[in-house]
Amino acid sequence: MVRAGAVGTHLPASGLDIFGDLRKMNKRQLYYQVLNFAMIVSSALMIWKGLIVLTGSESPIVVVLSGSMEPAFHRGDLLFLTNFREDPIRAGEIVVFKVEGRDIPIVHRVIKVHEKDNGDIKFLTKGDNNEVDDRGLYKEGQNWLEKKDVVGRARGFLPYVGMVTIIMNDYPKFKYALLAVMGAYVLLKRES
């Protein structure tokens, strides 16, 4: 007979009796699992902060949320960004920018660059699949974007990998269920 909580054993639970499994753990196992979970979360945060420093972008990875950039990028594509201040913005580049008053960044192509004599650079964007430029998306009275509006420039992508994020935002119950299952797995997984 196998005793619950014995090292290297795991008794299958009938259904998902998460709290029953937690009660069966001794305090040391529970502390270990909580610490393990905290290490996973803090490691993910450190990797994210490291990417921010390496890429110069406040958001080094973004998901394309609409079809406005088709055929170049589709809804759900994952973009990798850089935003080095010394690199000039050129027509034809795909940029991710934020508009004052909007929470979600926009992924569009630079179609015109306007450089003043004093060195100030302004530019105009448009989605590849859109009929008109983005002036209607900019804040009222703004006709051009400036470098400060740019979150990053697309340097690479993974097709459709970001659909998981879109599904989790479109169906919040799915997101919470997935997070609960992952959290329960980390807490209840026992080392052999």
Curated annotation (Swiss-Prot):
Please give the InterPro entries that the UniProt record associates with this protein.
LexA/Signal_pep-like_sf (IPR036286), Pept_S26A_signal_pept_1_CS (IPR019758), Pept_S26A_signal_pept_1_Ser-AS (IPR019756), Peptidase_S24_S26A/B/C (IPR015927), Peptidase_S26 (IPR019533), Peptidase_S26B (IPR001733)
Q: What is its main location?
A: endoplasmic reticulum
Where are the stretches annotated C-terminal short (CTS) helix? 177-188
- Name any one GO molecular function: peptidase activity
Catalytic activity line of the entry? Cleavage of hydrophobic, N-terminal signal or leader sequences from secreted and periplasmic proteins
Where is this chain's protein located in or outside the cell?
Answer: Endoplasmic reticulum membrane
In short, the EC number is: 3.4.21.89
How this protein is processed and modified after translation, per its record?
May undergo processing at the N-terminus.
The annotated topology with respect to the bilayer is: Single-pass type II membrane protein
Residues assigned to the Cytoplasmic compartment are 2-28
Keywords, alphabetical: Endoplasmic reticulum, Hydrolase, Membrane, Protease, Signal-anchor, Transmembrane, Transmembrane helix
What do the Gene Ontology cellular component annotations say?
Answer: endoplasmic reticulum membrane; signal peptidase complex
**Where, in residue ranges, is this chain on the Lumenal side?**
49-192
A single Gene Ontology biological process assigned to it is: signal peptide processing
Catalytic positions?
Answer: 68 (charge relay system), 108 (charge relay system), 134 (charge relay system)
Q: Which Gene3D superfamilies match?
A: Umud Fragment, subunit A (2.10.109.10)
Self-association and partners:
Component of the signal peptidase complex paralog C (SPC-C) composed of a catalytic subunit SEC11C and three accessory subunits SPCS1, SPCS2 and SPCS3. Within the complex, interacts with SPCS2 and SPCS3. The complex induces a local thinning of the ER membrane which is used to measure the length of the signal peptide (SP) h-region of protein substrates. This ensures the selectivity of the complex towards h-regions shorter than 18-20 amino acids.
Write out the domain note. Answer: The C-terminal short (CTS) helix is essential for catalytic activity. It may be accommodated as a transmembrane helix in the thinned membrane environment of the complex, similarly to the signal peptide in the complex substrates.
- Its biological function? Catalytic component of the signal peptidase complex (SPC) which catalyzes the cleavage of N-terminal signal sequences from nascent proteins as they are translocated into the lumen of the endoplasmic reticulum. Specifically cleaves N-terminal signal peptides that contain a hydrophobic alpha-helix (h-region) shorter than 18-20 amino acids.
Please state what the protein is called. Signal peptidase complex catalytic subunit SEC11C
The uppermost taxa in this organism's lineage are: Eukaryota, Metazoa, Chordata, Craniata, Vertebrata
